[in-house]
């Protein structure tokens, strides 16, 4: 009787834990006139199964992509980052692209989504790119 009660108690927890495993959030800040870029960027991020959240900030000729990798794949962050960077470099050779899995860059990119002043966004993207280069 105890085994059956424990089984009925724990089964819902396992089902709830598995139900939201495939959700992925992708947000994009796009102030350019290029309309197809948004769909392409969303597509590349969505195709990356290891990523559960992504933010892309596209201003002028700059593209900053911040990704959050699923926790159990944290040891593969660098490889995932390099693979996605290569995809964007091939797809957009005329853009300055930076892909990062660093949480601080993700957090700062998230703040940029709310920013209304485009010049401030451009300046912040430059600062974030410099910060990312310093960390490597």
Model features per residue range: what roles?
Residues 1-4:
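Positively charged n-region of N-terminal signal peptides that target proteins for export
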Residues 64-78:
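A short interface-forming secondary-structure element
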């Amino acid at each position: 009787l105890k085994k059956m009660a424990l089984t009925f108690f724990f089964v819902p927890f396992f089902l709830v834990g598995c139900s939201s495993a495939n959700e992925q959030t992708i947000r994009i800040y796009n102030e350019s006139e290029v309309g197809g870029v948004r769909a392409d960027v969303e597509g590349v991020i969505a195709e990356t199964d290891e990523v559960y959240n992504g933010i892309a900030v596209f201003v002028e000729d700059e593209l900053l992509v911040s990704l959050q990798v699923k926790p159990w794949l944290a040891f593969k962050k660098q490889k995932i980052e390099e693979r996605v960077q290569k995809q964007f470099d091939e797809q957009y050779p005329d853009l300055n692209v930076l892909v990062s899995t660093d949480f601080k860059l993700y957090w700062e990119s998230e703040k940029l989504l709310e920013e209304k002043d485009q010049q401030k966004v451009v300046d912040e993207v430059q600062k974030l790119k410099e910060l990312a280069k310093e960390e490597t």
